[in-house]
C-alpha cells in the first residue's frame, strides 16, 4: 500500500503562515490592582502633569518678560493728544518728524506739562512701533511737526526700513500671542 500519501499525525505539528505564540511564562493578570493603588497612580500622574505645566508656564513667563510693556496705541494717543493735537489726524497718529522727541521734551519743560520723560518716550515708542504707523510710511508721504505742518517727506530707504520693522513687530506679536496662550491655558 501507499503509506507515503497518508498524512502522518504528530504532536509537534508546525502551523502554516502563523507566527508561533509563546504560551510558557506568560503573565496573566487575573485580578485588578487595589483601588488605593490606582488612586495613588492617578495622583502621581496628575502631579507630574501639573509640574510640567508649571515649568512650561515659568519658561513662557521668562520668555515673555524680555519684551517691552508698551501702552496700547489708544493709550499713547490719549496721552499726547491733549498737549499736541497737531500730531494727530482725528485719533490716528500722523507720521512724526525726525527728532520730534527732543522737541517734545523741550516743550514739556517750557510749558510745564505734567508728563514725565518716561511716559513721553513710551508713548512715542508705542505710536512709532504700531502697525498702522508703519503701514503709513510709504515713499512720498509727509512727516509732521508738533503744530501739524509738513516738514519733510518719507524716502525710499525709510519705507524699506518701515517694512522690515513691520515684519519684525508682527513676528514678535505672534510669538507673544503664543507665549500668552501658554500662560492662559490651564
Curated annotation (Swiss-Prot):
Q: Where is this region: Disordered?
A: 1-22
Keyword entries, A-Z: Conjugation, Plasmid, Repressor, RNA-binding, Transcription, Transcription regulation
Membrane found in the keyword field: no
Give the protein name, as stated in the record: Fertility inhibition protein
Described function: One of the components on the FinOP fertility inhibition complex, which inhibits the expression of traJ gene, which in turn regulates the expression of some 20 transfer genes. The transfer genes are responsible for the process, called conjugal transfer, in which DNA is transmitted from one bacterial host to another. RNA-binding that interacts with the traJ mRNA and its antisense RNA, finP, stabilizing finP against endonucleolytic degradation and facilitating sense-antisense RNA recognition.
Report a single Gene Ontology molecular function.
RNA binding
Q: Which family does the record claim for this protein?
A: Belongs to the FinO family.
Q: Which domain of life is it from?
A: Bacteria
InterPro entries in the record, alphabetically? Fertility_inhibition_FinO_N, ProQ/FinO, ProQ/FinO_sf
Q: Does the keyword RNA-binding apply?
A: yes
Name its species.
Answer: Escherichia coli
Amino acid at each position: 500500500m501507499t503509506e507515503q500519501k497518508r498524512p502522518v499525525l504528530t504532536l509537534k505539528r508546525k502551523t502554516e503562515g502563523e507566527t508561533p505564540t509563546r504560551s510558557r511564562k506568560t503573565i496573566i493578570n487575573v485580578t485588578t490592582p487595589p483601588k488605593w493603588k490606582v488612586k495613588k497612580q492617578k495622583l502621581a500622574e496628575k502631579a507630574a502633569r501639573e509640574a510640567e505645566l508649571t515649568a512650561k508656564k515659568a519658561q513662557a513667563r521668562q520668555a515673555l518678560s524680555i519684551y517691552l510693556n508698551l501702552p496700547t496705541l489708544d493709550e499713547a494717543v490719549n496721552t499726547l493728544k491733549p498737549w499736541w493735537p497737531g500730531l494727530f489726524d482725528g485719533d490716528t497718529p500722523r507720521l512724526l518728524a525726525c527728532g520730534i522727541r527732543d522737541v517734545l521734551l523741550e516743550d514739556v519743560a517750557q510749558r510745564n506739562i505734567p508728563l514725565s520723560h518716561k511716559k513721553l518716550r513710551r508713548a512715542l515708542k508705542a505710536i512709532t512701533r504700531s502697525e498702522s504707523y508703519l503701514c503709513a510710511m510709504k515713499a512720498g508721504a509727509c512727516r509732521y511737526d508738533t503744530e501739524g505742518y509738513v516738514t519733510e517727506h518719507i524716502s525710499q530707504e525709510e519705507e524699506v526700513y518701515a517694512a522690515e520693522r513691520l515684519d519684525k513687530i508682527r513676528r514678535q506679536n505672534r510669538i507673544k500671542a503664543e507665549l500668552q496662550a501658554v500662560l492662559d491655558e490651564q
